[in-house]
């Protein structure tokens, strides 16, 4: 027996597994971050359009999740950062956290999970927003295969996938495939509470697709039909008048203005402003 004193735990315990609890009392247990509290506070920042505050909030909790070895928490925050940087136009940061999120899926062996599908969609949407459409389509196809083969995939996830994937196909000039997915998105979101907002966005995307395929003059009747339907959906009584509604109003307003629906565009901007001022 050595006279150097008792063995220390690190001298006889196996290395910790970062994805599971250690049966021998891990020296560095996982400290989960409060996921719902993080999301609730993020909603508060976004309802006030406090993008700087939202960024600080997310980066703080990402660091906490990293220090606490909470891989699930890191994945959640990375997904939110992808969306944040996409909305604020930060290409480099959006791609950085997209790739970090994808690597976390590999680390956790989550690539066949619904969480993976959500991450693929978020990353693909960011790549699409900054013109990397082939990379986006690759990720959307992964998500589509996963969602459609998984029983009980939530309708809002499928609807969001179909709409955003169609937008990429439209950009690539693959119009028949794009319209097929837009129609799937419309049908799917009919079953989602508050899904009228996503349906309105899809209608406007379809109007742009018609204009791109046929030209504004030839496609005018169909374009106006889609714009009228989008206006109806945005003002449907089931639409939630919250921070997200304000964001959607701001997002849709320029499209209405582009096609000459100036009164509708101004009304949407006014509604968004009123919601933000009340927040």
In which residue ranges do the predicted regions lie?
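Residues that mark the junctions of alpha-helical repeat units in TPR/alpha-solenoid scaffolds
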Residues: 34, 54, 67, 74, ...
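Short coil/turn linkers that connect adjacent helices within long alpha-helical scaffolds
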Residues: 28-29, 67-70, 107-111, 149-153, ...
């Amino acid at each position: 027996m050595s006279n150097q004193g008792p063995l220390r735990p690190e001298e006889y315990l196996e290395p910790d597994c970062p994805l599971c609890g250690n049966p021998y009392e891990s020296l560095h247990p996982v400290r989960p971050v409060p996921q719902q509290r993080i999301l609730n506070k993020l909603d508060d920042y976004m309802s006030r359009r406090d993008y700087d505050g939202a960024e600080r909030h997310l980066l703080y909790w990402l660091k906490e999740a990293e220090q606490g070895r909470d891989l699930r928490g890191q994945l959640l925050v990375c997904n939110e950062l992808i969306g944040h940087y996409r909305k604020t136009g930060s290409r480099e940061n959006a791609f950085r956290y997209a790739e970090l999120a994808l690597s976390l899926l590999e680390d956790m062996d989550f690539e066949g999970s619904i969480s993976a599908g959500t991450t693929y969609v978020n990353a693909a949407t960011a790549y699409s927003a900054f013109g990397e459409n082939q990379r986006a389509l690759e990720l959307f196809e992964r998500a589509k295969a996963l969602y459609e083969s998984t029983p009980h995939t939530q309708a809002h996830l499928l609807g969001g996938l179909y709409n955003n994937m169609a937008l990429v196909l439209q950009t690539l000039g693959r119009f028949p495939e794009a319209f097929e997915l837009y129609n799937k998105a419309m049908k799917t979101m009919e079953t989602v509470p508050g899904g009228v907002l996503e349906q309105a966005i899809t209608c406007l995307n379809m109007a742009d697709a018609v204009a791109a395929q046929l030209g504004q003059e030839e496609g005018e009747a169909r374009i106006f039909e889609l714009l009228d339907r989008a206006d109806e959906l945005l003002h449907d009584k089931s639409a939630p008048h919250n921070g997200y509604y304000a964001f959607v109003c701001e997002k849709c307003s320029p499209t209405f203005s582009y096609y000459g629906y100036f009164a509708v565009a101004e009304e949407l901007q006014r509604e968004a402003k009123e919601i933000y001022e009340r927040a």
